[in-house]
Amino acid sequence: YQSQIACKGLVSLAFSQSGQSPDLVAPTRFFSEGGAVTAAFVNKADSPLAKAAQWVFPLHAGTEASVAATKSYIAQLVAGARVVAAWQGDQDLQSALTALPDDLARAAQMDWSVALDVLQGVDRLFVIGRGTGMPVALEAALKFKETCGIQAEAFSSAEVKHGPMALI
């Protein structure tokens, strides 16, 4: 820990709902003091993380009423995707992000209750992802733990036969 890192030329992006976590604030401050360019994507623009970073990008997700912080998580994904789309000049991704509010509104109107039949009585859950879906699987597992109180674990679909399947 606390090893020397060559920070010059480094860009550090930190994503947080509250901007309070010392696990994010300390390295952001360390990188910034070491000459890195630091940016914080936060729901609370006056947070310690925002103060530690050189650039602040408010997420504008609104007040979180739940520990799961789903609005902030979606806002973080969108912010990250917007940065990538602009940086890489990815017109397809930019178009998809422009359409996203309407797509999310349609998804919110759908009847998702059929999932209850699948999940009823479940006390353990595997969430599988791969590639860009792996971080989403990790977050989904966390949401199930936080909101349902069940053992939910995320695994890469590329590795699921080498351990998780042995548990079944």
Model-derived regions, located:
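Glycine-rich phosphate-binding loops that contact phosphosugars or nucleotide phosphates
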Residues: 1-102, 130, 165-168
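Residue-level recognition of alpha-helix initiation/capping sites
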Residues: 22, 110, 135-136
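Amphipathic coiled-coil/heptad-repeat helices and related helical stalk/stem segments
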Residues: 24, 111-112, 160-161
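Cofactor-pocket helix-loop regions in the catalytic cores of large enzyme subunits
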Residues: 96-129
